[in-house]
Structure formats: structure tokens, C-alpha cells
């Protein structure tokens, strides 16, 4: 019984019970794989990257909770997490982080040298993000880089090169990530102010909704540029239009700046990523 309780706590620490983060990391990875392959990617590469997304996202959650272990107990949304509640010790958390990183690295060792080299940068970004909340009001920028680093890695693994379009896609993902993670930060803004945690939601203040809108628009413009540069099928743009409709819906949700609607807006971004993926996948398969 004790072992089951501990296993459940480890799963909660790694957020295996909350797949939204994995999905937000997975969609851009799939965008890159399908664009790099100009169709269906190599199956081995696809499986490695999907598994890598799951394990590295879990590792990111573990190190995030380790970094925030002295703050989470003072925040309503995070007070019952495994570390502040005493279910998982600091040593156990670091052990789980090391195990997840090791499994991810074993997976990436089956890729080419360029991909392996890029994975080291990805690990640094993933480990650095949680600590940025102490030093900058834009930890979301670092998160965007960490979440988007799978894009150049995907191009390296699938195509063996890093073309300009890979960095355009990386940029689009950073813009999108800052937008949706600011929505997420709006949920905790009051608590973060009390405990001294920095975030884009605090930095943007009363201009938060406008800046999120600008970031969302910039994401769409960058994705249009990518579609134009690759001469993607017109169906791609119809899916971008549907994604823009979801951005409008999110703006309505965050209008009140209340916790629940802001969190709902954040969760809605899963469908944005999915729509863009479908647009890319269908387009490249039709060409």
C-alpha cells in the first residue's frame, strides 16, 4: 500500500496524470518532423521523439517542482503537490529527474551526431527554466526556447540539417508559448506577487490581454510565412484560420482575468497546436 502511494506521488510529480504539458510540447515537435520529412517522417525517429517528449516533459516538471519547493506551499494551486505536501523528498525528486533525463538521453543516442549535440542544449534549457522565475519577469521566454528546442532537433534527426524554416518554426513556437504560458501565469498572479515569483503576467500588468493578442497574431503571421516559403497547400491556411478562431475565443475567456477562465484558455491551446499539425500533415501529404 505504501509503495502504491509513493508510486502515485512520483506520477503526480512528473505530471503523468496531466498530459496537457506533453501535448503542448508534442504538437510543435510533430510540426517539425512532418515539415522536415515533407510527409510522413521516419517511424524510428517519430517514436523516439514522441517518447522523448513524454520523458523530458516529465523531467521538466520534476525539476520545476524542486526549484519551487519553498514557494509552492504558499500558492493555492500548487500547495498539495508532492513536494510541498511532504510526499516526495528533495533527494527522491532529484533521483527521478536524473532517471528521466537518462532514459531520454539513451533514446537520443539512437539519432545522428547533430541531434545528440543539440540535445545537450535542450537539457540546459529545460533545467534552467524553473530557476528563471527568480531573476526575470520573462521566464516564459526561456520556456518557449525549451519547449521549442525539439524543433531544430527534429530537423537534425529527420533531415540532417537546420534550414531557415526550422528557426522560423522555432520562433513561432516561442511566441505561442509566451502567449499561452502568460495565460497560465495569470491564474497564479496574485499568489506569485505575495511570494516574490516573477512572471510575464506580472510584467505585462493591465496590458496582458493586448500583449497576448499581439503574440498570438505574431505566431499566425510567422506560420503564414512558413507556409508561403514552403509553398504549402491552401488547406494549411484554412487550419490556421480555425486556430485564429481559437485565439479569439481565448481572448474572450481571459477578459475577466479570473482564475478558472484563464486556465481554460491555457488548456484550449492544445487544440491550437492540433489544428496547426493537421494543417501541416494534410498539406504535405497532399503535395
UniProtKB/Swiss-Prot annotation:
> Which key words are in the record?
Cell inner membrane, Cell membrane, Magnesium, Membrane, Transferase, Transmembrane, Transmembrane helix, Ubiquinone biosynthesis
- Pfam family example for this protein? UbiA
Q: Which reaction does it catalyse?
A: all-trans-octaprenyl diphosphate + 4-hydroxybenzoate = 4-hydroxy-3-(all-trans-octaprenyl)benzoate + diphosphate
Task: Give GO terms for biological process.
Answer: ubiquinone biosynthetic process
Q: How does it sit in the membrane?
A: Multi-pass membrane protein
InterPro entries from the entry?
Answer: HB_polyprenyltransferase-like, Prenyltransferase, UbiA_prenyltransferase, UbiA_prenylTrfase_CS, UbiA_sf
Write down any Gene Ontology CC term.
plasma membrane
Enzyme Commission number(s): 2.5.1.39
Query: Needs which cofactor?
Result: Mg(2+)
**Membrane-spanning segments:** 20-40, 43-63, 94-114, 115-135, 137-157, 159-179, 210-230, 235-255, 266-286
Q: Which GO terms describe its molecular function?
A: 4-hydroxybenzoate polyprenyltransferase activity
SS bond partners: none
Q: Can you say where in the cell this protein is located?
A: Cell inner membrane
Pathway assigned to this chain's UniProt record:
Cofactor biosynthesis; ubiquinone biosynthesis
The record's section on PROSITE patterns has: UBIA
Mostly located where? membrane
Q: What this chain does, per the record?
A: Catalyzes the prenylation of para-hydroxybenzoate (PHB) with an all-trans polyprenyl group. Mediates the second step in the final reaction sequence of ubiquinone-8 (UQ-8) biosynthesis, which is the condensation of the polyisoprenoid side chain with PHB, generating the first membrane-bound Q intermediate 3-octaprenyl-4-hydroxybenzoate.
What the entry lists under PANTHER family is as follows: 4-HYDROXYBENZOATE POLYPRENYLTRANSFERASE, MITOCHONDRIAL (PTHR11048:SF28), PRENYLTRANSFERASES (PTHR11048)
The text of the family note is: Belongs to the UbiA prenyltransferase family.
Its name, as the record gives it, is 4-hydroxybenzoate octaprenyltransferase
Q: Which gene encodes it?
A: ubiA
